């Protein structure tokens, strides 16, 4: 699902980067926001073939709503979608990211515990660079 990854990358710019430096033109900023919103709308109608594809789509939707105009009904259905697929995901990095974004929407302590466990495992596997941003995001949610 290339579209899911594209939305994740666009949303990441707003979540993790200095987007105030990137978008000095309001027209460009609006264009990116519109692209994210259109991508979210498209992804809510698609279903992944594999658990990983479904997780990528759910993650992109939740990331998109973290930086764009929110739609609580779509967020709720995406959370259901994510919770259904989370136990089936083998990719720990993907599972960790999706778990953190789910936690950021519902603040379920079990999700936070799972995210911390996954972050710890990934660090022990030498994949710290892949979780540094999501770990900081988790900490900001727990604040």
Predicted regions and their residues:
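Short coil/turn connectors between adjacent alpha-helices in alpha-solenoid helical repeat scaffolds
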Residues: 18-33, 62-77, 103-115
